[in-house]
Structure formats: C-alpha cells, structure tokens
Amino acid sequence: REEFEAISAPNFDERGQVGSEYLKIFKELWTNENPSFSGEYESFDNIFFAPKPVQKPHPPIWVGGESAPALKRAASLGDCWYPIGSNPRFPLDNRDRLQARISRLQGFAEEFGRDPNEIDLAYSASWFETSPNQKREKWFIGSPDEVTEDITQIKELGVNHLVLSFPGTSTSEILDKMSY
C-alpha cells in the first residue's frame, strides 16, 4: 500500500482492475497507428506512440496470479498464465491443485470466447527440500529422480515454461541447494 501511495498510484485495492486496464492500454498503444483509449483510470486520444513492437501483434503478455480475478485477467487479456506455486492462499504445489487452477483458467477463457489452448502456461517454484526424510506432499521435495518426476508432471499438464528460483542469501548457498 505504501508504494502505491508514494507514487500517487490508484488505490491499492483496485490494483487488479488497474492492471487489467493497463494491459488494454498497452495493446492499444502497440497495435494501432492512432491509439485512443477511454477507461476508468486512464484516457487518451490523438497521440503518437513509437516505436511499435517487432513482435506482432505485440510481445506476449504473461499474467501472474492465482486468484479468480487474476485467472480472469489471464483468460481475457493474457497470452500466458504465470502462477507462483508457493502462494500460501492458493498453493499450486502438486498435480491436483495445479490441474484444478488450469481447468478454471480454461473455463474462464471459454467464457470470454477464447480458445483455452491459445493461452500458454508457465509455472514458478521457489521451494526445494532435498532431505531424504521429508514427506512428499508437494512437488520439489525429495531426490533428483523425484524432482524429475515432478517436472514431468508439470509438463504433462501443458506447462511450457518452468522458472525455478532457489532461495538463499549468497551464490554459494544457492549453488549448494541446486547441487543436491
């Protein structure tokens, strides 16, 4: 909240709606020679915007978030859905949980008249436990073979982009965690 207030941004509680509007604005700026837009937070017309993106119609828009509003944003405006698997409110740390959210995203896409298969899927994991005594209730806990199986399951769900963020405060600590 403080960051929003410090830069006189729209209300923090409206950040989802603001984000959706800004995505629409970017698409307008990137794809039209004479962009114009009238929204709740921003409006403009008769402006020149350059350079236009090389990628057509525009660079892929990755939309993060795991909540229903975020899924709707990804389904209506995104080219890729990019959830963080470790969100404590919406943990997506095993096959069943991620599959349920993907199904919900696809349902929203259909409601918006989009082909769900046109929305690419990404996934971010930032927890790892290599202790052989650790109970395997979620992905990325266990032996290298078990983690390999986790990655296979994620791919089988249609995820094409996997981001692994290893926690640590130093390069050596991070490398140690990566090298099990």
Region roles according to the model:
Residues R1-Y180:
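Active-site-adjacent structural elements that line small-molecule/cofactor binding pockets in enzymes
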